[in-house]
């Protein structure tokens, strides 16, 4: 819910899995959240920006988390398309 100023005022905003778009429940202790840093192409230094990926426990249990993270990173341009 938003107030008149457009700020979110909900007490709890659930996370969603980046790969499957499932809601990650509070009791899903196998889920992970990963921040991937963006670096400057010239200097190779961290520029203060990052991409956040959340993977639910069901994807990790199936052994598909590495493929899902690679697919998401390719879509965001972090990893080259021909990797």
From Swiss-Prot:
For the biological process aspect of GO, one term held by this record is: translation
What is the annotated localization of this protein? Cytoplasm, Cytosol; Cytoplasm; Rough endoplasmic reticulum
Q: Where is this protein primarily located? A: cytoplasm
Annotated Gene Ontology cellular component terms? cytoplasm; cytosol; cytosolic ribosome; cytosolic small ribosomal subunit; endoplasmic reticulum; nucleoplasm; rough endoplasmic reticulum; small ribosomal subunit
Q: Which GO terms describe its molecular function?
A: RNA binding; structural constituent of ribosome
Q: Which UniProt keywords apply?
A: Acetylation, Cytoplasm, Endoplasmic reticulum, Isopeptide bond, Ribonucleoprotein, Ribosomal protein, Ubl conjugation
> At what sequence positions does the UniProt record place the cross-link Glycyl lysine isopeptide (Lys-Gly) (interchain with G-Cter in SUMO2)?
41
On subunit structure and binding partners, the annotation says: Component of the 40S small ribosomal subunit.
Protein family per UniProt: Belongs to the eukaryotic ribosomal protein eS21 family.
The job of this chain, per UniProt, is described as: Component of the small ribosomal subunit. The ribosome is a large ribonucleoprotein complex responsible for the synthesis of proteins in the cell.
Q: Which PANTHER family match?
A: 40S RIBOSOMAL PROTEIN S21 (PTHR10442)
Its name, as the record gives it, is Small ribosomal subunit protein eS21
């Amino acid at each position: 819910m938003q107030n008149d100023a457009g700020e979110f005022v909900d007490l709890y905003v659930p996370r969603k899995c980046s790969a499957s778009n499932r809601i990650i429940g509070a009791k899903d202790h196998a889920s992970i959240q990963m921040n991937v840093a963006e670096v400057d192409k010239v200097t190779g230094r961290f520029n203060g920006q990052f991409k956040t990926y959340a993977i639910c426990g069901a994807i990790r249990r199936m052994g598909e988390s590495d493929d899902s993270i690679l697919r998401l990173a390719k879509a965001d341009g972090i990893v080259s398309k021909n990797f």
